[in-house]
Amino acid sequence: MLDPLVPTAVYKAPDFTEGQKFHPGEGPHTTNGKTTQISDIVIKAGGEDRDKPSDAKDTQLGQLRAKLTTLQDQLNIFLTKRMDHEKSRSQEEKDLERQVLDEGVDDDSD
């Protein structure tokens, strides 16, 4: 039987000619997301995840919940990589600007 409850997402931005599509895939799926847990720093300091979700029930809605967690992980990873790329690109532009200002413009028009 085909599962009718399969979430999908499409990320659109002006710099994307086509939207970035996300699909949870075949699994396995869990409600314990990779990107929605408390940070490793907090865990190492003895912190506890008090908001940890319950396991998904073996029902259509339970499986949908787990697939949504997978989809959320995919989106979070994609957006984090995108932000890191933008940050490094911005830093490269700042470095280039600083280099031009420090060295001046080479004007050979004399």
Swiss-Prot record:
Role according to the record: Component of the EKC/KEOPS complex that is required for the formation of a threonylcarbamoyl group on adenosine at position 37 (t(6)A37) in tRNAs that read codons beginning with adenine. The complex is probably involved in the transfer of the threonylcarbamoyl moiety of threonylcarbamoyl-AMP (TC-AMP) to the N6 group of A37. GON7 likely plays a supporting role to the catalytic subunit KAE1 in the complex. The EKC/KEOPS complex also promotes both telomere uncapping and telomere elongation. The complex is required for efficient recruitment of transcriptional coactivators.
The keyword Transcription belongs to this UniProt entry's keyword annotation: yes
Biased composition (Basic and acidic residues): 82-101
Name of the featured protein: EKC/KEOPS complex subunit GON7
Entry GO CC: chromosome, telomeric region; nucleus
Organism annotation: Debaryomyces hansenii (strain ATCC 36239 / CBS 767 / BCRC 21394 / JCM 1990 / NBRC 0083 / IGC 2968) (Yeast)
Lineage: Eukaryota, Fungi, Dikarya, Ascomycota, Saccharomycotina
Gene name as annotated: GON7
Gene Ontology BP term (one): tRNA processing
Keywords from the UniProt entry: Activator, Chromosome, Nucleus, Telomere, Transcription, Transcription regulation, tRNA processing
